């Protein structure tokens, strides 16, 4: 009896397995290129009802795929340098599918590039293509470090251009706020570095752009990153996480970070003179600060033509400063001992909510709509007291600020035609600040409202070796401070002409016209200083400034690994807003005024070295400045960096920057040693782990001296940054990127909550 039961059980089990195997569908792919070339690596994704059933990789010896059961499926194939292949199939039986994959053309500035790694020169910049070695990297910053016109720090995850500017990062031409961290280098088609921006970005005070073009496949993906960095001993650090998870049509991105600063010491030596009085103080300022940043982004792409995104961000910041100074007070040559104490508390809390929609038309042109609302609160409490003999001279500062800001941007992006490319749009921004001065009773309330409405149109075209981009706009500026109202209409313009002298030489001439409103702090007639001798006040009569930037650059590719760029720039600022001093009763008032023209000339060169394991950059520059009614002021600067990759798993990076002087309309600052001198090392034991260590500032104790010298007032202040000088630190990061090629692109525009 037992034998019969056992045999019956085995027969049922065999039948069950057989039926299961019988229900499976086997698909054999015969994959090749248009020229019958063999494609060595093809990735496949099988989806059913928006769920991923299978994700696998084919090679020349394995092109078979197994489907669990009969039904309707969506099958996608992708390969490097080939256009993706997709098909919706209703599978009932085993089948053989022949697939011919077409190579991907990349159209940029009317230049179509197929299968080439040679950089493409445009009217506004240059487009680069990552090497096969860079595409195999897991860290996008490590991959981007091979671009010769960028200075990339994979340890701090930062990117700057050759002149030290922090560029705006775009993904496929769209502003983003989640950065490039989730990107897998294999998904990067090209990287465009734009030195001249169109009128669309002028109202955002953007002058450099990095545009990263991605492949179009969008599989199921998961991205998670944990990062923590700390000085030794503890002074400055952070801990936080980034994550992104989603399917082919919906995704959620989040970021949570805590930043801190503690026991940060800065030493001061201050000398002040006024009439027959003199103060000389020496002491230290100890700071501590805590920041909390939260970001959530929801992305929804119902189809290839429509994209939606919702974002919410919160930033909370608290800072405390405490200082004690000792010295002497001199009045009519009579000296007395003096002690001063300073205590400051700053708090801020800002929220940002935004919505973004993009619609793509049949001809691949697109319409973008971006709306946002920002609400922020900030307050400062400061108490300063001077003790001279038995006298106590206290000064208080108590300011509260509430800001509400709303914006709406509408942009049309045309496609490239034989006659060129056209873009147009309108940007509206309204900002309202309520500022309370609580020192008085009752509190004094000041209202500041600023509006900007900006319309523009851009045109670009390429004629063989000549490339043109021209962009013009009209901006309406409206300012109201309490009962005073002003309105202005100003033009905006951006023009760039590029000329390809030869395959290795390019010249570019550019001109930019822009307008900048005064900040609310420059407009409010409320003192923001606790110095008993000096007040700092705004001026509600300020007008917008206008800037004219003219630049000429000449790029030479000397060798495959060696590039030289020479540049000459001239900036003219009319209605220049500058600081000035005036005497009023027993006070020296520092305020702001529109004072004619400001001119700045800048010239220099940059030398880039980019070999297999070494990236280096060195750039000296000379500058001349001229304020209205003043003398011509000169300065020089030098910045450089060196990155050496050892065995592809370890990087050593050195960064340094020198500058001898900087100027304002009333002061001069001298730097006695380098402004920065850092060394760091990163080790990647696995694709998921990064361990880094370094030393901040190797140039001794960083110091600077600022001097104000006028007939009515003299001040000399020396600052020594003890805590940040020669400070070791350590960083640990753990990153997971799974099936990143199916990620939804993040097109939500970036919003700076500090602007």
What does each model-identified segment do?
Residues 203-210, 217-266, 289-292:
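Outer-membrane beta-barrel translocator/receptor signature
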Residues 96-100, 110, 140-143, 158-159, ...:
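N-terminal periplasmic accessory domains that precede
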Residues 293-319, 341-484, 488-494, 500-504, ...:
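Face-selective signature of the C-terminal outer-membrane beta-barrel domain
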Residues 153-197:
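Periplasmic plug
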Residues 684-755:
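C-terminal beta-signal and adjacent terminal beta-strands/loops
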Residues 515-565, 572, 590-602, 719, ...:
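Outer-membrane beta-barrel signature, preferentially recognizing the C-terminal barrel domain
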Residues 227-232, 247, 258-262, 314-320, ...:
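Transmembrane beta-strands of outer-membrane beta-barrel pores
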Residues 34, 42-47, 78-80, 96-133, ...:
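Short, acidic, small-residue-rich periplasmic hinge/interaction motif at the N-terminus
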């Amino acid at each position: 009896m037992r034998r019969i039961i056992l045999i019956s059980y085995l027969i049922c089990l065999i039948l069950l397995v057989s039926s299961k195997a019988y229900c499976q569908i086997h698909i054999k792919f015969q994959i090749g290129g248009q020229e019958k070339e063999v494609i060595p690596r093809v990735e496949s994704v099988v989806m059913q009802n928006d769920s991923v059933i299978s994700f696998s990789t084919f090679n020349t010896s394995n092109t078979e795929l197994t489907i669990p059961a009969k039904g309707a499926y969506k099958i996608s194939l992708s390969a490097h340098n080939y256009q993706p292949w997709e098909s919706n199939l209703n599978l009932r039986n085993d089948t053989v599918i022949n697939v011919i994959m077409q190579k991907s053309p990349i159209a940029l500035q009317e230049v179509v590039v197929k299968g080439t790694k040679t950089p493409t020169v445009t009217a506004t910049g240059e487009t680069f293509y990552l090497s096969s070695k860079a595409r195999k990297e897991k860290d996008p910053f490590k991959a981007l470090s091979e671009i010769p016109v960028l200075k990339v720090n994979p340890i701090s995850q930062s990117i700057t251009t050759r002149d030290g500017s922090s560029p705006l990062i775009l993904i496929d031409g769209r502003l983003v706020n989640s950065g490039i961290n989730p990107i897998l280098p294999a998904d990067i088609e090209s990287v465009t570095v734009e030195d001249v921006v169109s009128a669309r970005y002028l109202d955002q005070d953007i002058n450099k752009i990095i545009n990263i073009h991605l492949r179009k496949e969008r599989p199921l993906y998961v991205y998670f990153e944990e990062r923590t960095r700390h000085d030794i001993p503890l002074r400055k650090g952070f801990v936080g996480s980034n994550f992104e998870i989603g399917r082919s049509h919906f995704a959620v991105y989040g970021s949570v970070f805590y930043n801190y600063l503690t026991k940060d010491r800065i030493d001061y030596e201050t000398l002040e003179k006024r009439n027959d009085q003199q103060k000389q103080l020496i002491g230290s300022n100890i700071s501590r600060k805590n920041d909390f940043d939260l970001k959530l982004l929801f992305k929804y792409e119902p189809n290839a033509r429509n994209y939606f995104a919702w974002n919410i961000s919160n930033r909370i910041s608290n800072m405390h400063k405490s200082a004690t100074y000792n010295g002497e007070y001199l009045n009519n040559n009579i000296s007395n001992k003096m002690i001063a104490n300073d205590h400051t508390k700053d708090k801020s809390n800002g929220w940002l909510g935004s919505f973004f929609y993009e619609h793509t038309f049949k001809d691949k042109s697109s319409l973008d709509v971006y709306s946002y609302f920002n609400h922020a609160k900030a307050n400062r409490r400061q108490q300063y007291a001077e003790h001279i003999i038995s006298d106590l001279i206290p000064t208080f500062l108590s300011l509260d600020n509430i800001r509400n800001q709303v914006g709406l941007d509408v942009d049309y992006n045309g496609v490239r035609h034989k006659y060129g490319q056209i873009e147009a749009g309108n940007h509206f921004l309204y900002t309202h600040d309520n500022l309370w001065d609580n020192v008085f009773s009752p509190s004094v309330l000041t209202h500041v409202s600023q509006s900007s409405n900006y319309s523009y149109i851009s045109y670009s075209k390429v004629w063989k070796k000549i490339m043109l981009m021209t962009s013009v706009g009209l901006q309406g500026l409206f300012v109201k401070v309490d009962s005073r109202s002003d309105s202005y209409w100003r033009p905006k313009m951006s023009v760039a002409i590029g000329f390809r002298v030869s395959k290795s030489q390019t010249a570019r001439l550019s001109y930019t016209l822009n307008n900048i409103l005064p900040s609310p702090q420059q407009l409010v007639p409320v003192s923001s200083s606790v110095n008993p001798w000096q007040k700092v006040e705004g001026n509600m009569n300020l007008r917008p400034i206008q800037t004219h930037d003219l630049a000429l650059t000449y790029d030479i590719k000397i060798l495959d690994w060696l590039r030289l760029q020479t540049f000459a720039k001239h900036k003219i600022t009319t209605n220049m807003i500058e600081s000035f001093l005036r005497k009023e009763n027993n006070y020296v008032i520092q305020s702001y005024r529109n004072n004619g023209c400001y001119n700045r000339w800048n010239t220099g060169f940059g030398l880039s070295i980019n070999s297999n394991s070494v990236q280096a950059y060195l750039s000296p520059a000379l500058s001349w400045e001229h304020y209205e009614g003043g003398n011509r002021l000169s300065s020089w600067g030098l910045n450089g960096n060196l990155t050496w990759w050892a065995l592809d798993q370890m990087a050593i990076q050195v960064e340094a920057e020198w500058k001898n002087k900087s100027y304002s309309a009333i002061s001069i600052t001298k730097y006695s040693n380098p402004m920065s001198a850092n060394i760091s090392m990163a080790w990647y034991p696995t694709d998921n782990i990064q361990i880094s260590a370094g030393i901040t500032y190797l140039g001794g104790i960083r110091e600077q001296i600022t001097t104000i010298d006028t007939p009515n007032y003299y001040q000399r202040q020396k600052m020594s940054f003890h805590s940040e000088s020669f400070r070791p630190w350590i960083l640990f990061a753990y990153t997971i990127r799974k099936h990143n090629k199916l990620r939804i692109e993040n097109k939500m525009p970036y919003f700076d909550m500090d602007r």
